Amino acid sequence: MVYHHHNHESRIIHCRKQLTSWRRRSLLLTIIVVTATVVSLISQEAEAHNQNAPPILYVRERNWRISETEKVGQIIDRVRAEDPDGDDLIFGIEPRFSLPGGENDASPPEKIPFQIDRETGVVTLNESLAGRAGQNFLIYITVTDGSYTAKNEVFINILGERENSSGYRPQTSISNVVHNISQFLPRFDQLPGVQSIRNGLPNSRPGGWYPPVPQNNIFGPPPFGNNYPPPPPNIPGVRGEQSGEEEQPDEEVTPTTPVRISSTTPKSRTKLTPITANNSTRVESAIPAETTTPSGGHHNNSSSPITIFSLKSGTIPIVVTVGGFFVAIAVLLAYLCRRRLCAISRTLKKTKEKEELAKKSNQSQLSSTLTDDSRNSMVMQQWQGPVAFANRYVPWERDQQMGIATSQLSTGVTNGGVSSPGVPSPGTGEPGSNLGPGCLTGGAGSSGAPENAFAGEANCDRWEFPRYRLKFFNILGEGAFGQVWRCEATNINGNEGITTVAVKTLKESATEVDRKDLLSELEVMKSLEPHINVVHLLGCCTDKDPTFVILEYVNRGKLQTYLRSSRAERHYGNTHGKSNVLTSCDLTSFMYQVAKGMDYLTSRGIIHRDLAARNILITDDHTCKVADFGFARDVITSKIYERKSEGKLPIRWMATESLYDNIFSVKSDIWSFGILMWEIVTLGSTPYPGISAADVMRKVRDGYRLEKPEHCRRELYNIMYYCWSHDPQERPLFAEIIQMLDKLLHTEMDYIELERFPDHNYYNIVSLSGEKL
């Protein structure tokens, strides 16, 4: 009994599975059948409504009256055609067989004496018409696009020689008559696939071209003065002229539309037949077909029913059905995957909110740092540069440093919690503490030697500052291998809160030599005590690449740029904020302050080697600070440094012994200071204007010196000239220069007459020879 019950339950479960499987298969089969049905309906509808439009044929004259004396090769007419689909068109000529019945029917000639160019549509005479005067016959001018053929009837009337003077010959070239312009530039109504009807076409035809047509539509003999055989009756496309009455349609029933032609040409019919179909097949048109009456001339008012195919009536239901089918499928899929879609939307929303908060915080911090003077000042234009992305330091080699950080962390855990190398320890990071963040500590078992000797020495000094406290903004300036960024440092140099600083670093393209130069500059600045005329070092980051040298931020920037920008303000003035117009006393004070700063560096045994206006920074209160110690060397022992490396050189600022003997000393800095004085007097002009670097070296060696500017007095120029003595021992010291400039400052004389400054004599040149400007 138990076995029977168990067997029964298993059968029920098996039946349920089969039923579920059958339902799934039925649903899938239904979807496939519906899709196939929709596709077949669309394909059938597309085949039923072939969008290929027939060509449109234009024949200027439907009645060619040609003299039998015409020469072979004469152009009879020019036929035009166009195709809305842009298909290639082929022209042709066919004989027109008249309707049966009637003795006066025009019979086609044995051979059509015309030929047409298949591409251009030019109809020419290909055989002589001599002896064929009086013949009348009909031909078809055809054009095909490969799918449909359009035909226009043309009535041919061959005239005798004596009738040539009084007869009419249709024009074969472009006429100057105004009314013939409409033959070439017709206006079209928007009717799909057929020829359009010209608005205002007269219902009556002017007399004189065709013989009068009697009431029974039988043509009589033409009024030519001779008894030629009459034209055929019931000519399709030719309607008799009925005065005061409407035109009577012909007996032939053809779905055609009249061609819009000149008012002087008769109306005709265009017969459209597919090439592959029988010529008797009716071509359904989008316009009602014309109906005819019997030859009795009575007009039939009742029109026969005609099926009008509409593209909208067939395609709209199909499109709606298919669209509804796909919408239903989309709704079903969205319902089934609603949980995943909601999770994706929540993730995107959170990401967008985080980005907006980050942007708002960055904008608020930037706006709180920049003052109105820094925004509006014309001098601050040189500070504009690319903005850092996300205000976050990103190391160059992430993968390598991730491995280093992992090894350092594991080492710290092994040593019982002692700080590992390179990992910031809790602290202020201020220069006043001997063990700040980033300092190397650890016991005997600690591993992780510094990458280089310079970094090893710097990691345990008071200048190390944690990188995460730096927030980068924009580039203040850059050279071939270095960059200076404007940053914000938190709690640096004993100052609580945020301090704006300048961070000097190297580009990724820098070489090992450039890296050593930056570390050498850092060592030079570490040996200096704070001085008002020397840029102050605030800290550094040397625990790993890239090395950061943190300097005080001088908001006015380079003295060279400041002097050049003062030229425009001297002429046009400053309408915003504090005026920057410089005076003779200001310029002399700049020289005095630079001399004070260089005297301090000299007393500490420092040779600058690149003293120029571009390496002097200036503050809002016109305080000058010597900066850029990239070439500086500590030569306190020998007093002389001999250059061994190659690179860009400030040729126009270098002394003769530096140019030719590679010898640098305090006296070579004195020479450069004289050039700096000339720069200040000329408001930032390039020394030796108009002379190449090679000529400068040769002329300076031969005794040539910078000439005295016109607006500079002799007393000030003499100080410059003393600095350019060929013998270094004859040049003054910085202490002596300070005394001479101090005397000039205490007099009321303007030694720089800026009102006489010749703007046209001094200009700035670009570096073309690899020199440093």
From Swiss-Prot:
Signal sequence annotation: 1-48
Chain positions recorded as ATP binding sites: 476-484, 504
Protein kinase domain boundaries: 470-749
PANTHER family: TYROSINE KINASE RECEPTOR CAD96CA, TYROSINE-PROTEIN KINASE RECEPTOR
Ranges annotated as biased composition (Polar residues): 254-283, 290-302, 361-373
Enzyme class: transferase
Organism expressing this protein natively: Drosophila melanogaster
Protein name: Tyrosine kinase receptor Cad96Ca
GO biological process: calcium-dependent cell-cell adhesion via plasma membrane cell adhesion molecules; cell surface receptor protein tyrosine kinase signaling pathway; Golgi organization; homophilic cell adhesion via plasma membrane adhesion molecules; negative regulation of cell size; positive regulation of phosphatidylinositol 3-kinase/protein kinase B signal transduction; positive regulation of wound healing; protein phosphorylation
Glycan attachment residues as annotated in the record: 126, 164, 180, 278-279, 300-301
Keyword Glycoprotein annotated: yes
Residue intervals on the Cytoplasmic side: 337-773
This protein's GO CC annotations: apical part of cell; plasma membrane; receptor complex
Protein EC: 2.7.10.1
